[in-house]
Amino acid sequence: MLYSSRGDPEGQPLLLSLLILAMWVVGSGQLHYSVPEEAKHGTFVGRIAQDLGLELAELVPRLFQLDSKGRGDLLEVNLQNGILFVNSRIDREELCGRSAECSIHLEVIVDRPLQVFHVDVEVKDINDNPPVFPATQKNLFIAESRPLDSRFPLEGASDADIGENALLTYRLSPNEYFFLDVPTSNQQVKPLGLVLRKLLDREETPELHLLLTATDGGKPELTGTVQLLITVLDNNDNAPVFDRTLYTVKLPENVSIGTLVIHPNASDLDEGLNGDIIYSFSSDVSPDIKSKFHMDPLSGAITVIGHMDFEESRAHKIPVEAVDKGFPPLAGHCTVLVEVVDVNDNAPQLTIKTLSVPVKEDAQLGTVIALISVTDLDADANGQVTCSLTPHVPFKLVSTYKNYYSLVLDRALDRESVSAYELVVTARDGGSPSLWATARVSVEVADVNDNAPAFAQPEYTVFVKENNPPGCHIFTVSARDADAQENALVSYSLVERRLGERSLWSYVSVHAESGKVYALQPLDHEELELLQFQVSARDAGVPPLGSNVTLQVFVLDENDNAPALLTPRMRGTDGAVSEMVLRSVGAGVVVGKVLAVDADSGYNAWLSYELQPETASASIPFRVGLYTGEISTTRALDETDAPRQRLLVLVKDHGEPALTATATVLVSLVESGQAPKSSSRASVGATGPEVTLVDVNVYLIIAICAVSSLLVLTLLLYTVLRCSAMPTEGECAPGKPTLVCSSAVGSWSYSQQRRQRVCSGEGPQKTDLMAFSPGLSPCAGSTERTGEPSASSDSSGKPRQPNPDWRYSASLRAGMHSSVHLEEAGILRAGPGGPDQQWPTVSSATPEPEAGEVSPPVGAGVNSNSWTFKYGPGNPKQSGPGELPDKFIIPGSPAIISIRQEPANSQIDKSDFITFGKKEETKKKKKKKKGNKTQEKKEKGNSTTDNSDQ
């Protein structure tokens, strides 16, 4: 590597340049080659290595290079054979333009030693460019008045080639008007031109299309063309000419103003202003013509501007002229003859006199609606008139006299289908062409009250939650009346039905205009489950028409009643219940029972029992049944247990939110040999438990007798009213019997509230009531019960079947098919290992049935009145001291039914069970009265004995 004097390589390019310059002088030489333009790639140009005296083997070692000096890679050298060839397309016109000489200058540089050779490659021209005109089309405008031999210069073509290839010759397409003037070689300044050799006529030849062709002198010849479009300009050398010299037109005498008479047409062969024509009447036209006709100056249309009368003038002769706008102007003339024709120019005239408008839709057929008269001023056939009516209408025209008609009713009317008719009466004369006139008759159809209000459906079902606010909107009834005005004005009212002492108006009301139904008082599901009534819709027509719709209002239950405790509460114990238990009892022994009832339904009435946390400790040897409320021992009692146990039992329903009640049970543990001289049930202010219980039983018996008497009187009154009522005057839809019970246990009594279904509608009344006295099995029957054992005297242990005469309420009978028994042994069973909880199962009997047990519902969808009663023998276990007698509850009402366990040899008086609503009732009254007295004595003795046992 060479370095400069400062020791860096910056001096190397300078040194290399000096060496190249030196070798240039030593090895300079020049070669000449030629190649035609547009030669293909690889075309041989020359053996450059051989011509330069270089060996083929030294081309690569000596770094043979070819420099075209900015000409690109048009030429290239094959280093294997030293041949110079064409590498890419060579276009002479692109390289040198129109220059006569065109060469490519090359430099060949070889190294070791450095030599430079000059090579000139001449590019020879070929005829590869055709002649080209400046434009493909040339427009020439020549007036038809130009004289002969007029010359019009043209622009020639150009050829990019040179020499013979650029030598052009011209020729013109054959025609009779022009020839081509081509300058000779001595007239280079004179341009190419067209020479006119025949006069032009625009009307004959408005345009000429010529083709000018240029041909070069190359081999092969190439040509170029240009279209010559020659437009001949017009001169005013033609006058306007009409199609005809005489136009004949016929017009009726009643032609209207503005009617086009004729449109004479004139044409001018000239164009532009020379061909624009102006129409007018001739100057010698009469004033009468000018008063009746008008001619448009531009279009030449003649129109009527005055009245024409055949009797006044039968023909009008109109001279017309057409003048162009050329200079000088030229004119053409014609005549228009207008003949007036007598025609039927008077149309019929209609006169209508209406008599009965509007027409009632119940009008009789043939009713005259209007009188029509027609007139025509013409004579003969032109004055003969016929009338017609709009088709497909319930009316017709009846001819009564010449040119007189009556419009009468032809078919029955229905305003609800069509409320009005627009009739068109057409009168047509016999002229040719006939003339007609029309008149409209509006016929309104008056409404009659022939449509009753109609409801969308015959019955509606509405669900309303209980405890609604008074005046609450519960539903809206709507009836549609197809009539109009007063006949369609609907008012609503309740179909009044009295339900005992209460009227339907005390429950609901309906707005007379809007049809909105309102609850007048808070509805109570426990009192009223279904309110069925009818709403009447009546229009204001004469006579008024109406229709009824049935509304079934179901009152949905809400948890608005807390559980009510039925456990007897003695005076002096602050509402607590006292029980005595022997210390010798073992585990799983029932020592007491907490009884509660919920007036709600479904889940809202499903009760569960549990001990309060403060009393449910491990040291307390008692537990309470989750669904039975029975208090039983969890283990055997011993001396370490406190002699007095205070239990707090929480009674909770399953409503949302849940409501609760708390019962306090005081359990006293006594020894087996200890006589209960005093009891926590005793009161400080009481003279003795026996006296208190006896007094209470007396009052209870009196109350039962009073209630029974009231029921008997009610039944008798109902029977009388039913027998005297019409079969169609039912106040209640067919319903199910309602169970009414009363019972006495210990020193308290409760009676079930009466659950009603208040209905108002068609159908006979039905009120089936049933009552039974305390201490009896709830089986009904008068003669069928003979020989049936009591609930406590059944020694076989099989469940006792209810008497077929037992009649359930609607909800109770519904529960017979899907009841769930929560048995004492099926819910919680105590054992040595602690309580064993089992889920309720659907069954008809349990391993340890309890006489008179009622099964509570499992789901919220089961009504509390749908529980199934079971009757069977009592629990074989003997009741412990202080244990309450077995009972069953009817959820949904505060009623409690006691099933007393009588001795095995005791006999139940069948007459103590009374069933109301039976046909045999009147035959058994005396027998039942005796049975009631005997049973009351027995009950009084049993109650005294039971109290003393406790």
Curated annotation (Swiss-Prot):
It is a single-pass type I membrane protein. InterPro entries: Cadherin-like_dom (IPR002126), Cadherin-like_sf (IPR015919), Cadherin_CBD (IPR031904), Cadherin_CS (IPR020894), Cadherin_N (IPR013164), Protocadherin/Cadherin-CA (IPR050174). It comes from Pan troglodytes (Chimpanzee). Residues 30-133, 134-242, 243-350, 351-455, 456-565, 588-678 form the Cadherin domain. PANTHER family: CADHERIN-87A, PROTOCADHERIN ALPHA-9. Coiled coil: none annotated. It is found in: Cell membrane. Residues 734-894 are annotated as: 5 X 4 AA repeats of P-X-X-P. Residues 759-808, 827-950 are annotated as: Disordered. One of its GO terms (biological process) is homophilic cell adhesion via plasma membrane adhesion molecules. Potential calcium-dependent cell-adhesion protein. May be involved in the establishment and maintenance of specific neuronal connections in the brain. Residues 30-697 are extracellular. The chain crosses the membrane at residues 698-718. Residues 909-923 have a biased composition (Basic and acidic residues). Residues 789-798 have a biased composition (Polar residues). PXXP repeats lie at residues 734-737, 799-802, 832-835, 873-876, 891-894. One of its GO terms (molecular function) is calcium ion binding. Keywords: Calcium, Cell adhesion, Cell membrane, Glycoprotein, Membrane, Repeat, Signal, Transmembrane, Transmembrane helix. This is Protocadherin alpha-9. It comes from the Eukaryota. GO terms for cellular component: plasma membrane.
